[in-house]
């Protein structure tokens, strides 16, 4: 789903963009060697204690979230521009873990915000721009999961709040 809205005014131009992705199905069939292994497991030749993963109904499991949202709100007037960008990724179950009461371990959703400010100008007859940005404005950390880095790197990033300053000149 995409929603786009633009308005021009005396105090500047405003732009709002929202994109939402919603999955209701995410399935993968076993093929090749996995198909043969699944047949052996179905026949009882491979014990139930040995899981075969990566196919079947994968929605909401192991990094496959069922929704993702992006929102960008920007304003510009003359040489000035400010933009706020948000990204939210939905929650999912980590199937290799469970809670003591038998409930599945849910890796919660994660939302990050980025703020960018820029100014365009001329420098010695060349177009130039200076930009300052704060990525992960609220210092959101990736949700804890039982993975190599303590979070699900296939679905999340754990960079923490960071800043950059960019200077561009067109020669």
Would you name each region that the model predicts?
Residues 1-6, 114-120, 167:
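Short, well-ordered amphipathic alpha-helices
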Residues 54-59, 99-105, 150-155:
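Extracellular loop and loop/strand-boundary signature of outer-membrane beta-barrel proteins
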Residues 9, 64, 75, 106-108, ...:
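Surface-exposed coil/turn segments at beta-strand junctions on protein surfaces, enriched
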Residues 101-120, 128-131:
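Outer membrane beta-barrel transmembrane domains
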Residues 24-27, 85-97, 119-171:
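C-terminal beta-signal and adjacent terminal beta-strands/loops
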Residues 1-96:
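Gram-negative outer-membrane beta-barrel transporters
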Residues 1, 65-69, 109-113, 126, ...:
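Residues that define the transmembrane beta-barrel architecture of outer-membrane proteins
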């Amino acid at each position: 789903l995409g929603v786009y809205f633009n308005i021009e005014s005396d105090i500047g131009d405003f732009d709002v963009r929202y994109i939402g992705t919603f999955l209701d199905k995410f399935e993968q069939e076993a093929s090749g060697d996995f198909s043969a292994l699944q047949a052996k497991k179905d026949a009882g030749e491979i014990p139930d204690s040995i899981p075969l993963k990566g196919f079947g109904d994968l929605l909401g499991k192991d990094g496959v979230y069922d929704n993702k949202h992006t929102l960008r709100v920007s304003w510009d007037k003359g040489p000035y521009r400010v933009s706020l960008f948000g990204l939210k990724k939905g929650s999912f179950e980590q199937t290799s873990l469970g809670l003591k009461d038998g409930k599945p371990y849910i890796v919660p959703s994660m939302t990050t915000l980025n703020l960018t400010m820029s100014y365009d100008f001329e420098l010695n007859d060349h177009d130039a721009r200076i930009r300052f940005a704060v990525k992960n404005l609220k210092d959101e950390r990736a949700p804890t999961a039982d993975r190599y880095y303590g979070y699900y790197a296939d679905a999340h990033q754990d960079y923490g709040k960071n800043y950059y300053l960019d200077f561009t000149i067109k020669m």
